Every structure is written in structure tokens, then in C-alpha cells.
Amino acid sequence: MPASTRTASIERRTGETSIELTLNIDGSGMVDSATGIGFLDHMLHLFARHGLFDLKVHASGDLHVDEHHTAEDVCICLGQAFDRALGERRGLVRTAHAYVPMDEALGFVAVDLSGRPYCVVDADFVTPRVGQLGTDLIAHLFESIAIHGRMNLHARVLYGRNDHHKVEALFKALGRALDMATRIDERLGGAIPSTKGVL
């Protein structure tokens, strides 16, 4: 698939949220995120900048209830955008990983754009919230990206003290791992990177 076509626009409207998201995999890290959840916007900004993705997200939701529905649906849309933008996934490097330090915290993410969704998150947090985002949601957000992006995603905080730093390390590592996994390997000549011939 030519790099110029690796974009996607997703709209999701439910009784709980209204979301518009646009992704350009082959971007330069331009970000416009307005979800109503400041810490989530911060993480999406870091994710896209470290992955060099162009990302635009405008979301409104039932934040008078809590942040769960809005944060979850944004990550559902993000996963769907990657799946749509990658098409048949021809020529992809496909698998990649990244370690990212954030001060005293170290995060690790490995991804396989296999078409088979699975997610493992190994991270312990000591505070219930970082900003407006519950730390109990972090694993669920990564799961939403993995399931709807049809990718195998493993994320781990190896160590750290500050929960903000831990989450930041994970989102940066996810951006960098996906940047590498979505690159085109010219040696494949546009072939699907699987012995099955399909992803």
C-alpha cells in the first residue's frame, strides 16, 4: 500500500460519546487533541509525537458521569484508525518493540500487527488517578487500541515511583513501537508479512 494512502478517519457516535478522529501514519507528529480529559490529551500528544503520526481527535462525552466512556471510545477509534489505514498490511515490518525511560520510570511495549488482537498490560499504580484519568483505566485503554487495531500488544512498566511517569513511558513506548512496526520493509516487495499470506 502506498504510504500516501495510509490515513483513516473514524466517527463514532453513541448515547454516551461523539468522536471524530483522523490519523495519518506517515505524518510528522502533528497533534490536535480535544477530548475533555486533559491527561488523556497529554498522552495522545506524546504518543503521536513519538510515533510521528499526525493525529486529530475531537471528542465529547458524558464526563458528568466519569471519564470512562470518553477515554475508552477514543481508544477504540484510535485502534480502528490504525486497522483501516493499514489496509491489507502489505510490506509492513509488522513487529517491533520500544523501551522508553521517563525519569525514574521505565516502560516497555512490544507490538505485532498480526491481525490477531491480544493485549497484556503489566503495570502497577499507587494512586487512583493521574489528573482526570483513573489509573485503573490504563490497561483497558491499551486493550481497546489492541482489539480494534487487530494487533498483539504487550505493555509493561519495569519500575518507577511516579504514576504520571509510568503512564507517560508506556504511551511514548507505544508510539515508538508502532512507528517501527508500521514502516514499510522494501525487501518484502509489497508482500504480506506472514507465511499464511494474509493478516
From Swiss-Prot:
Query: GO CC terms for this protein?
Result: cytoplasm
Record-linked CDD domains: IGPD
Pathway, per record: Amino-acid biosynthesis; L-histidine biosynthesis; L-histidine from 5-phospho-alpha-D-ribose 1-diphosphate: step 6/9
Which EC class heads this enzyme's classification?
A: lyase
- Quote the InterPro entries the UniProt record gives: IGPD_sf, ImidazoleglycerolP_deHydtase, ImidazoleglycerP_deHydtase_CS, Ribosomal_Su5_D2-typ_SF
Instruction: Write out the entry's keywords from A to Z.
Output: Amino-acid biosynthesis, Cytoplasm, Histidine biosynthesis, Lyase
- What SUPFAM superfamilies does its record include? Ribosomal protein S5 domain 2-like
Q: Which Pfam families match?
A: IGPD
Enzyme Commission number(s) from the entry: 4.2.1.19
Q: Which GO molecular-function terms appear in the entry? A: imidazoleglycerol-phosphate dehydratase activity
Q: Which domain of life is it from?
A: Bacteria
Q: Where in the cell is it found?
A: Cytoplasm
Q: What is its main location?
A: cytoplasm
In the record, biological process GO terms are: L-histidine biosynthetic process
- Quote the catalytic activity from the record: D-erythro-1-(imidazol-4-yl)glycerol 3-phosphate = 3-(imidazol-4-yl)-2-oxopropyl phosphate + H2O
Name the family: Belongs to the imidazoleglycerol-phosphate dehydratase family.
Q: Which NCBIfam families match?
A: PRK00951.2-1, PRK00951.2-4, PRK00951.2-6
Q: What is this protein called?
A: Imidazoleglycerol-phosphate dehydratase
